[in-house]
């Protein structure tokens, strides 16, 4: 923590420190707002996001790597957009807000994944194929873990993070006339559950989950293509030797 504070104080690009401070103030405002509205769960989310906003500086302090300006801004946007989706109901007020975040998440986690092999062993820096494959796999793995989390929250706490979709047709072995035969119900116009009429059959989040994972995978593939074409000309991270120890002087390792 002391090293992170020193990194902020010796920031060679002061606008980054001011942007980070503005983000933390926005998170603090959102937390106070949630407490005043009595939504303690939202206030807890804000607290966690406040820690998340500090992650770019934490990574730089712990790894002695300097994050590019573009990635720094993109990470802050992604973290705050995720919080705003819940706190300010943007998931419901702006169409495809959730999908946009999953697309951004696919890019962010693939980017981080492409640098993990280098962090483990510097000799992998030039092995671009390995880094591309690891980036895509890492992003897909994070996407799957997130969907596990959403499933658990829906299953055990009665939430609806895996948003339901009304479908107009069902194809299932459970409907078949014999073992191994798929039965179908087509052109579903209405369903009644315990006396409650619905406009169609609820899929209990399956379509939303698969859509999220495909979008996140697409984001990872997009990053992989850009990474391959860039050929290291615009690195997202730059290894530094003593950036946090020499009052803002950046020394390339």
PLM regions with names:
Residues 6-22:
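N-terminal membrane topogenic signal
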Residues 10, 58-70, 121-127:
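Membrane-interface helix-boundary motifs at transmembrane edges
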Residues 22-36, 55-57, 82-86:
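Membrane-embedded alpha-helical segments in integral membrane proteins
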Residues 35-40, 62, 87-97:
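Membrane-interface helix caps and helix-loop-helix hairpins in membrane proteins
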Residues 47, 66-77, 98-103:
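Cytoplasmic-side transmembrane-helix entry/capping segments in multi-pass membrane proteins
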Residues 53-57, 78-82, 139-150:
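Alpha-helical transmembrane segments of multi-pass membrane proteins
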Residues 102-109, 134, 138-184, 201-227:
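Alpha-helical transmembrane segments that form the membrane-embedded catalytic/substrate-binding core
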Residues 234-253:
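Short, highly charged, low-complexity non-transmembrane loops/tails of multi-pass membrane proteins
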């Amino acid at each position: 923590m002391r090293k992170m504070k020193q990194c902020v104080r010796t920031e060679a690009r002061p606008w980054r420190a001011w942007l980070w401070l503005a983000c933390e103030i926005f998170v603090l405002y959102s937390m106070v707002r949630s407490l005043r509205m009595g939504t303690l769960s939202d206030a807890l989310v804000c607290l966690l996001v406040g820690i998340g906003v500090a992650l770019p500086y934490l990574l730089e302090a712990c790894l002695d790597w300097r994050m590019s300006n573009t990635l720094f801004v993109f990470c802050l946007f992604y973290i705050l957009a995720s919080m705003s989706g819940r706190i300010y109901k943007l998931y419901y007020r702006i169409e495809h807000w959730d999908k946009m975040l999953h697309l951004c998440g696919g890019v962010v986690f693939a980017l981080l994944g492409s640098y993990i092999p280098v962090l483990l062993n510097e000799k992998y820096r030039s092995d671009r194929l390995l880094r591309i494959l690891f980036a895509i796999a890492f992003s897909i793995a994070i996407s799957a873990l997130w969907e596990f989390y959403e499933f658990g929250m829906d299953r055990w706490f009665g939430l609806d993070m895996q948003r339901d979709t009304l479908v107009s047709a069902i194809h299932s072995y459970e409907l078949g006339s014999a073992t191994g035969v798929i039965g179908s119900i087509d052109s579903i116009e209405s369903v009644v559950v315990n006396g409650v009429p619905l406009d169609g059959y609820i899929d209990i989040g399956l379509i939303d989950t698969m859509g999220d994972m495909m979008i996140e995978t697409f984001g990872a593939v997009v990053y992989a293509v850009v990474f391959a074409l860039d050929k290291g000309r615009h690195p997202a991270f730059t290894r530094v030797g003593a950036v946090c120890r020499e009052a803002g002087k950046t020394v390339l390792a």
